[in-house]
Amino acid sequence: MADRLTQLQDTVNQQAEHFCNAIGVIQQTSLPSKFVNFERIGPQTPIPCPPQEDYAQLFAQLIARCAKDIDTLIESLPNEDSSIELQNSSLKRLEIENQGTARDLEEVVQKGELLLEKMQYSLECIAQAQLDMQITLKHDLQ
């Protein structure tokens, strides 16, 4: 549960980052507004900065994707309606399933160890046979 909450917090933080970045790009690329009774100091016509990319589309996609991720994570959290009995029965079921899987794993490990022993014995036999052949060849060549 804490893992999902951490993911949710990270995603919410990422969404906040997207909003801040979008506002920053808007500030950089937009033209300043004129206010009544306010004299501007400096150049009267600001030089517009042409946007390099379609930032509106990019940030819209990022924000929408992040919102979907947040919804998915929220949906994956457990309900408050689930009773303690229901949670306990789920835990018991998972524990029984885990025990069965552990037994299966032990059997597979035992079979693997037997196969390993057989393979090691076979490799020893092959190595011994090769040594015997080399000795025989040396005696035959002499």
Swiss-Prot record:
Stretches assigned to coiled coil: 87-111
Q: Where in the cell is it found?
A: Nucleus
Q: Which domain of life is it from?
A: Eukaryota
Q: Which InterPro entries match?
A: Med7/Med21-like, Mediator_Med21
One Gene Ontology cellular component annotation held by this UniProt entry: nucleus
Write one Gene Ontology MF term. Answer: transcription coregulator activity
Pfam families from the UniProt entry: Med21 (PF11221)
Instruction: Please provide the Gene Ontology terms (biological process) for this protein.
Output: positive regulation of DNA-templated transcription; regulation of transcription by RNA polymerase II
Keywords of the record, alphabetical order, are:
Activator, Coiled coil, Nucleus, Transcription, Transcription regulation
Chief localization class? nucleus
Sum up the protein's function in the record's words: Component of the Mediator complex, a coactivator involved in the regulated transcription of nearly all RNA polymerase II-dependent genes. Mediator functions as a bridge to convey information from gene-specific regulatory proteins to the basal RNA polymerase II transcription machinery. Mediator is recruited to promoters by direct interactions with regulatory proteins and serves as a scaffold for the assembly of a functional preinitiation complex with RNA polymerase II and the general transcription factors. Required for activated transcription of the MtnA, MtnB and MtnD genes.
Q: How does it assemble?
A: Component of the Mediator complex, which includes at least MED4, MED6, MED14, MED17, MED18, MED20, MED21, MED23, MED24, MED27, MED30 and MED31. Also interacts with MED7 and MED10.
Protein name (record): Mediator of RNA polymerase II transcription subunit 21
